[in-house]
Curated annotation (Swiss-Prot):
Name of the molecule in the record: Parathyroid hormone-related protein
Alphabetized SMART domains for the sequence: PTH
One Gene Ontology molecular-function label: peptide hormone receptor binding
Signal sequence coordinates: 1-24
Family: Belongs to the parathyroid hormone family.
Keywords per UniProt: Calcium, Cleavage on pair of basic residues, Cytoplasm, Hormone, Nucleus, Secreted, Signal
Start-end of Polar residues biased regions: 76-90
Location of this chain's protein in the cell: Secreted; Cytoplasm; Nucleus
C-alpha cells in the first residue's frame, strides 16, 4: 500500500514539474512569446523580410540567367564601331529593381530615397514690429512718468526743501513719501 502511494505521488510530482507541450510548443515558449518586446518583433519582422528578399533574388537570378547570357552573346557578335538605328534606344533590360522589398508600398515608385534636410541652427528670433496699440501705451507711460509727484517717475517735488540740519534725521515724520 505504501509502495503504491509513493509511486502515485512520484508520478504526480513528475507530471506537475514537467511542462506539458501545447500544440507542439512548450509552455515556456508560449510565455516567452507573449512577453516579447516591440523591438524584438521589429527585429524578427526585418529578419523575415530580408530572408524573403534573398530568396526572391535567388529565384529571379536563376529565372533570368539565360536571358542575361543571351544578351551578352548578341552584343559581342555586333561590331564595336557600329551605331544603333536612330529610332531604337538601348535601355538596359530590368526585370526587377534591387530596391524592391526594402521600402513600403507607397515608396516603391520613388527613384531617390528620402534625404534628410540639414537641421536649422537655432538663432535669434526676429521680433515682430510692435503694433500701434503698444506704441500708444509706451507714449502714455512716458508722459505719465514725466509728471512730477507720481510714483515711479523719479521726479519728486518736496513742498518743503530739506535745508535745515535737523531735518536730516531719518524720522518717519520728516519723510514725505
Amino acid at each position: 500500500m505504501l509502495r503504491r502511494l509513493v509511486q502515485q505521488w512520484s508520478v504526480l510530482v513528475f507530471l506537475l514539474s514537467y511542462s506539458v507541450p501545447s500544440r507542439g510548443r512548450s509552455v515556456e515558449g508560449l510565455g516567452r512569446r507573449l512577453k516579447r518586446a516591440v523591438s524584438e518583433h521589429q527585429l524578427l519582422h526585418d529578419k523575415g523580410k530580408s530572408i524573403q528578399d534573398l530568396r526572391r533574388r535567388f529565384f529571379l537570378h536563376h529565372l533570368i540567367a539565360e536571358i542575361h547570357t543571351a544578351e551578352i552573346r548578341a552584343t559581342s557578335e555586333v561590331s564595336p564601331n557600329s551605331k544603333p538605328a536612330p529610332n531604337t534606344k538601348n535601355h538596359p533590360v530590368r526585370f526587377g529593381s534591387d530596391d524592391e522589398g526594402r521600402y513600403l508600398t507607397q515608396e516603391t515608385n520613388k527613384v531617390e530615397t528620402y534625404k534628410e534636410q540639414p537641421l536649422k541652427t537655432p538663432g535669434k528670433k526676429k521680433k515682430g514690429k510692435p503694433g500701434k496699440r503698444r506704441e500708444q501705451e509706451k507714449k502714455k507711460r512716458r508722459t505719465r512718468s514725466a509728471w512730477p509727484g507720481t510714483t515711479g517717475s523719479g521726479l519728486l517735488e518736496d513742498p518743503q526743501p530739506h535745508t535745515s540740519p535737523t531735518s536730516t534725521s531719518l524720522e518717519p515724520s520728516s519723510r514725505t513719501h
